[in-house]
A protein has these predicted regions:
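Extracytoplasmic gate region of multi-pass secondary transporters
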Residues: 29-30, 218-275
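Residue-level signature of mid-helix packing/kink "hotspots" within the transmembrane helices
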Residues: 27, 57-65, 149-150, 267-276
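Juxtamembrane intracellular "pre-TM" segments in multi-pass secondary transporters
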Residues: 1-4, 190-226
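Helix-loop-helix hairpin linking two adjacent transmembrane segments in secondary transporters
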Residues: 141, 145-190
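Extracytoplasmic
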Residues: 10-42, 240-245
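Cytoplasmic helix-loop-helix junction between adjacent transmembrane helices
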Residues: 106-144
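Extracellular/periplasmic helix-loop-helix junction of adjacent transmembrane segments
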Residues: 32-62
C-alpha cells in the first residue's frame, strides 16, 4: 500500500468498482419496469416511469455543482464512502417499496448521494496521478461507469429469475459491503493534506469566496463551451439509456430479460473504447 508507484493505480482500481456500482444501481431500474409494474400499478403508465427516471437526473444535475464545492472542503475518502453507502442503502430499500411515491423519493435521494461521488473521485485520482498518467487514470476509472451500465442491464434478467425486490436487495448489499472495504484501503494523498494545512495556516492570504469562484467560472467562455459540449449529447444520451430497453421489448418483441442487457451492452462497449482512447490521446 505504501509503494508510491503502485498505490495510485490501487486508488483507480478501488474507485473503478465504485464507478461500476454507481452506474449499475442507476441503470438497472430502466430495465425493470415490466417486472415492477405488476406490484406497483402506477408504473404501467409511461409518464409515471418517465417521472421516476427524470427526478434522479434533475436532482443529480442540480447537486453536481454543490457536490464539487463540498468535495473541496470535506475529506474526499469519507465523501466517497458515505455516498456509496447511502445510494446502496437506497437501492436496498427500493426492494421494500410498495407504491410509486416511495420509489419516487428514494430515487430522489439516490440522485443526491450519487452526485457526490464523481467530483470526489476525480479529485482523488488527480491528486494521486500527476503528469502523463492522469488522463489515462481518469479514462480507466470512467470505464467502470460503462461496465456498470452494462451490468445494470441484467437487472431485468435477475428480476425474471428471482424477483425485482430480491434484485434491489442484493445489488444494494454488494454496495454496502464494498463501502466497508473502502474504509480500510482507500487513502487521501498525504501531499493534498499538507497543501490544505499550508493554506489554512497562511494568515495573510484571503481565501476566495464561493461567489467569487462562481463569478470567475461563469465569465469564462471555455466553461460555457465545455458545458454545452457535455449537455448536448446528454439529452439524447439519457433518453436512449432510459428508454432503449423498453423500445426493444415493445417494438421488437424481445423479452425484457434479454432487451435489458442488449440495450446497455451495445452503448457501454462503444463508450468503454472511447474513454480509453481519449485518455491515451490526452496524455
Amino acid at each position: 500500500m505504501k509503494n508510491k508507484s503502485i498505490y495510485p493505480w490501487v486508488v483507480v482500481g478501488l474507485l473503478w468498482i465504485v464507478a461500476l456500482l454507481n452506474y449499475m444501481d442507476r441503470q438497472m431500474l430502466s430495465t425493470m419496469q415490466e417486472a415492477m409494474k405488476v406490484d406497483i400499478v402506477e408504473l404501467n403508465k409511461a409518464e409515471a416511469f418517465g417521472a421516476l427516471m427524470a427526478i434522479f437526473l434533475w436532482i443529480y444535475g442540480f447537486m453536481s455543482p454543490v457536490a464539487g464545492i463540498i468535495a473541496d472542503r470535506v475529506n474526499r475518502k469519507w465523501l466517497v464512502v458515505g455516498s456509496l453507502f447511502v445510494w446502496s442503502a437506497v437501492t436496498f430499500l427500493m426492494g421494500y417499496a410498495h407504491n410509486f411515491h416511495e420509489l419516487y423519493w428514494l430515487r430522489a435521494v439516490m440522485g443526491v448521494s450519487e452526485a457526490l461521488y464523481i467530483p470526489s473521485a476525480l479529485s482523488l485520482i488527480a491528486d494521486w496521478h500527476e503528469g502523463k498518467s492522469r488522463s489515462l487514470a481518469v479514462g480507466v476509472h470512467m470505464t467502470g461507469l460503462y461496465v456498470g451500465q452494462a451490468i445494470g442491464g441484467f437487472g431485468a434478467t435477475a428480476a425474471a429469475a428471482f424477483s425485482w425486490q430480491a434484485t434491489f436487495h442484493w445489488f444494494g448489499i454488494v454496495g454496502i459491503a464494498y463501502s466497508l472495504v473502502l474504509i480500510l484501503f482507500l487513502k487521501e494523498n498525504p501531499i493534498h493534506n499538507i497543501s490544505i494545512k499550508k493554506i489554512d495556516d497562511a494568515p495573510k492570504e484571503k481565501k476566495p469566496s464561493i461567489i467569487s469562484g462562481l463569478s470567475l467560472l461563469f465569465t469564462n467562455w471555455a466553461f460555457w463551451i465545455i458545458l454545452f459540449y457535455f449537455a448536448a449529447p446528454s439529452l439524447p444520451g439519457w433518453a436512449t439509456k432510459n428508454w432503449l430497453p423498453t423500445l426493444f421489448a415493445d417494438s421488437l418483441n424481445i423479452p425484457m430479460s434479454e432487451a435489458g442487457p442488449i440495450s446497455t451492452i451495445t452503448i457501454a462497449v462503444s463508450s468503454f473504447i472511447g474513454v480509453i482512447l481519449g485518455g491515451i490521446l490526452s496524455d
